[in-house]
Amino acid sequence: SYLTDKEITDRLVTEAYNRMQEDVQVAHILIKTNPNVATDTAAAYTKIQAAYKRLQAGEAWDLVVKQTSEDNPTKETGGDLGYVTALLPNGFYAFESAAYETPVGKYSMPIRTTLGYHIVKVTNKRPARGELDIAHILLRVKADGSDDKAVKTRIDAVYAQLVAGDRFEEVAKTVSEDKATAERGGAIGPIAINQYEKSFEDAVFALANDGDYTKPVRTRLGWHIIKRTRKRPTLTLEQAKRKI
């Protein structure tokens, strides 16, 4: 009936809204499945259950990850995926639920996603970082890093200009080597977690107030100074209902 559908929808929206208040740092063990091969799914299920039994028997998480996980980029680092936040993409609701419902330091039972079977371990939780509008000044460094020192000297001089009172937007227009954003005063727009390199993200979310800017930050592209122009207000439940 309509009412039960609406009740289910409301419950899911409220759940998503509550989850959006927190970011969760997770690690995982992944056994991949090929959805086109039925026997493959059964074999993968057997493997994930074997890994789960090893954990239950007290074996170290990192060792079991290293020896069993099929997620090559993370298996050498304890399966660490960094922080995630609701809403995860379609097909990952079970993963999201495991992340939010498992206590810090514990791991979930095996769960299924479109990738395969996972065991999810929660390593930390923090208040959600939310979204910021930001701008930046970028001075590029060559891929081989040969001019890193010279560029660092230049960005330090730019930082000194800002400290002396020069307007961020004007300086960005004049010196920034990110052509796409320089002409609009360095404005990038909104940033949420997992969109930029960790050094960049951590620096900008550490800024306490609108209008504050970072000291020079190094990424693969070069040296940045990043300004927080506005913290986007946290949605109310009613606003979230319209968005979700």
Model-found features: residue ranges?
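Peptidyl-prolyl cis-trans isomerase
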Residues: S1-I244
